[in-house]
């Protein structure tokens, strides 16, 4: 963003949102290809020789607006040396530059909305990290959760209409509309696939931007209600949630929606409401009754359809009771369970046994899916019995031990936020014995012989980083270190498991 300031007149761009003239500037394409702005992309890479010149951009846009553009390119590719077979390359570069342009108004508003706020200056935080404080909230006091599949736009014109609130440049919107409708492979740019969304590998930057702007509008109702009621803001998740972009739009939506929602706001003033978005779905947990959650369900459907023309159905929102439902987030299974407890009370000569049930929210390691993944990777059979890894038999002994140990350490690191880590001992057993069987197969020996000769060394490789730190910090207080290790620890570098830690 600092590089933009050297080339853009920020006051004029921020006031009028005119970005179309910038598409003819060479440095926009340098930014799109991560080139430095101090050099010309023409001199730095001969592959981009004269591709982003003003003349090419003008001719390409003019040619794109012709109805017979695709036919013309197919029939005249050999006779037109200026465009020729590279027309798709020019279109690709033009679209990449356009993706940078449409992000400018959003980036400027985000910077202005964050001024004066105490926010952690970290580039590693993402909106997905708001799941961690979401799982640390007081879920044991909540009753219901709405499992919402984010509505997707059936018609691409909805995406263009969404950007009209931010980009006032009509020419830019026309060009975006042409990009979306001209090329066949972009007609289904956002397609729902199970619970998530898939994007084309080409031009992923623009596709992700359009999808995020779409979700930004979808989540606007939560911004408004959160601003109206101080209870909607979770103290523990405030730092993370402030980094999610749609909270930068609070002032705008208050001005737009205040008059429309005064009559029905009383329905939704819930002192215990928690919201998070994960992939293609979002979760709304509340202490409210079943009737209140049903009101939320049908109100959200009507709100999306009437105000944003986003087609949705009540069947895409599932209401579940937390005591009978498990949340599947980031590979964890989270649920509220009842811990029975009996208290003995004595009054004078009479004693009473009082049964009490205490709610507790647990994040559990999904052991069965993990064993299934290990089985597919040929570390064990479907029942979880360890087997050897023949394809690794050609490696050295140290490499074999290191690979097995790294897989377990990464899995342990990923599931460090679990409240019950006992399941990881089974994974540790499978990988440790699988490593021993692989070594025994390589040296044509027995497993017992290798465990006897390399037992301590093999066991040390499976120590996790947390266990090593605690053992060094508390060498004599093993109980203290184990107690600390049992606590849930969330690491910000956790995004996804990469095929069993890229074995």
Swiss-Prot record:
Signal sequence, start to end: none
Compartmental location: Plastid, Chloroplast
Any one GO BP annotation for this protein: tRNA processing
UniProt GO cellular component terms: chloroplast
Listed InterPro entries: Domain_X, Maturase_MatK, Maturase_MatK_N
Function as written in the Swiss-Prot or TrEMBL entry: Usually encoded in the trnK tRNA gene intron. Probably assists in splicing its own and other chloroplast group II introns.
Protein name: Maturase K
Underlying gene: matK
């Amino acid at each position: 963003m600092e590089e933009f300031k050297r080339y853009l007149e920020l006051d004029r761009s921020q006031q009028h949102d005119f970005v179309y003239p910038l598409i003819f500037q060479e440095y926009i394409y340098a930014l799109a290809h991560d080139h430095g702005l101090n050099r010309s992309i023409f001199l730095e890479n001969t592959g981009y020789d004269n591709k982003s010149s003003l003349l090419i951009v003008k001719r390409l846009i003019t040619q794109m607006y012709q109805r017979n553009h695709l036919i013309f390119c197919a029939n005249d590719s050999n006779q037109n040396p200026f465009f020729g077979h590279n027309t798709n390359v020019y279109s690709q570069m033009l679209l990449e530059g356009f993706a940078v342009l449409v992000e400018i108004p959003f980036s400027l508003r985000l910077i202005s909305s964050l001024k004066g706020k105490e926010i952690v200056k970290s580039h590693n935080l993402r909106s997905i990290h708001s799941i961690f404080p979401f799982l640390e909230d007081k879920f044991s006091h909540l009753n219901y959760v709405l499992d919402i599949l984010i509505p997707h736009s059936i018609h691409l014109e909805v995406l263009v209409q969404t950007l009209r609130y931010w980009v006032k440049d009509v020419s830019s919107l026309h060009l975006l509309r042409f990009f979306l409708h001209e090329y066949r492979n972009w007609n289904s740019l956002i397609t729902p696939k199970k619970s998530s969304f898939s994007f084309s590998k080409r031009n992923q930057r623009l596709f992700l931007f359009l999808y995020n702007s779409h979700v930004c509008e979808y989540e606007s109702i939560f911004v408004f209600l959160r601003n109206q009621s101080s209870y909607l803001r979770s103290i523990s998740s405030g730092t993370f949630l402030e980094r999610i972009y749609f909270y930068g739009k609070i002032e705008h939506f208050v001005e737009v929606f205040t008059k429309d929602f005064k009559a029905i706001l009383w329905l939704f003033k819930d002192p215990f409401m928690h919201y998070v978005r994960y992939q293609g779905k979002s979760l709304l947990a509340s202490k409210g009754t079943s009737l209140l959650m049903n009101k939320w369900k049908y109100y959200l459907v009507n709100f999306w359809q009437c105000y944003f023309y986003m087609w949705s159905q009540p069947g895409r929102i599932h209401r579940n009771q937390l005591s009978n439902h498990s949340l599947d987030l980031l590979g964890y299974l989270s649920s509220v369970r009842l811990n029975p407890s009996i208290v003995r009370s004595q009054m004078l000569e009479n004693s009473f046994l009082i049964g009490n049930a205490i709610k507790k929210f647990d994040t559990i390691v999904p052991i069965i899916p993990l064993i299934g993944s290990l089985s597919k990777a040929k570390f064990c059979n479907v029942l979880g019995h360890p087997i050897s890894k023949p394809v690794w038999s050609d490696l050295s002994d140290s490499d074999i031990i290191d690979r097995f140990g790294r897989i377990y350490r990464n899995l342990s690191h990923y599931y460090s936020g679990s409240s019950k880590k006992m399941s990881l001992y089974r994974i540790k057993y499978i990988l440790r014995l699988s490593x021993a069987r692989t070594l025994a197969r390589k040296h044509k020996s027995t497993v017992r012989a290798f465990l006897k000769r390399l037992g301590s060394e093999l066991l040390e490789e499976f120590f996790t980083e947390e266990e090593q730190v605690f053992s060094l910090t508390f060498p004599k207080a093993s109980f203290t270190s184990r107690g600390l290790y049992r606590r849930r620890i969330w690491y910000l570098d956790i995004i996804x498991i990469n095929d069993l830690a890229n074995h």
